[in-house]
Amino acid sequence: GFDGLGGLIYVLTQCAKLLDAPELRNEAVELAMKIDGDAIASDRMLDVISGAAGAILALLALYQATNDKAVLDRAIWCGRHLPDDPANWKSGNMTALAGMSHGAAGTILALLKLYDASGEQGFLIAAQKGLDFERGLFDPTLNGWPDLRSDTAKPDPVQWCHGAVGVGLARMAALHILDDASVQVEIDTAIKLVMLAPDGGRDNICCGHAGRLSMLAYAMRLGLGPENLDAVLFSRVASWLERVEASVKNVSDDASGNILGLMARDNILQTDLMQGLPGIGQTLLEILAPDLIRPVLLLD
């Protein structure tokens, strides 16, 4: 998945492309061969973050770069490892969820892309079952995909990991494979929720503002969303950067440091991609150079 071999394969694949370094692509292929039958059979997470769904996305990115059938075969094995019933797409001990990181949206995206690459109809059927399941989780009274990690359903805080950001990104990334009225409604709903989400709070790309901006930038690139989407996006980027810059400069000051939503509990600036400062850099690159820098949240 994202935090295992899949993440390493994806990074090497993208770096090979950006740096014109085929030796890195070869390393990615070597790593892909480690995703064998035993490794796949031992997967109990299944999701994008740690399981088969994330491995599928990373392997397909590598397959697109290499056209290596052995890489595609491993993605297919991962797809066949996923349970037929989306209600059993459970990450570890969690219940089956909506959303991208541990939920149905990420698995649906992986299956749709796998169908597109392999032509195996079963993956399309499985993805459609997943769509029906996730649509059943949408709560119109909450106007969102509820967070089911606790006993009391509550609206998600519009995040990539569990909320509208991830669902919207997943649907947009598969539009060339599956585009119907229901998908368009879901995309429109997700974009509206993200545009209405207030600035502030966490700034990271996984759970916070950077992820929301990444999603809006991707929608703008695809020509989706309302006419004022670009104005909203760039206005939010400008105000966000002012706040982040001020916070980073004063990160040693407790009061100022708390303004920056990238702080660990010990008030140390986090430096990992998903929770820390690199995610801000990644988001800005996606906005500034969309033809060169792919959305990392899609493992695309």
Residue ranges and their predicted role:
Residues 1-99, 105:
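Extended ligand-binding groove/face enriched in aromatic
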Residues 104-166, 170:
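Acidic, glycine-rich loop-and-beta core segments that form the ion-binding/anion-interacting portion
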Residues 199-236, 240:
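Loop/turn-rich, solvent-exposed surfaces of beta-rich toroidal or solenoidal domains
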Residues 11, 27, 31, 51-54, ...:
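Amphipathic, well-ordered alpha-helical segments in soluble domains
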Residues 1-5, 40-52, 88-105, 144-165, ...:
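Solvent-exposed loop and edge beta-strand segments that line ligand/cofactor-binding
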Residues 7-21, 56-67, 106-120, 166-180, ...:
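Well-ordered alpha-helical scaffold segments within catalytic/enzyme domains
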Residues 23-43, 74-90, 125-144, 178-201, ...:
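Long, well-ordered core segments of solenoidal/helical folds
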Residues 113, 173-181, 189, 193, ...:
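Terminal, non-catalytic domain-edge segments
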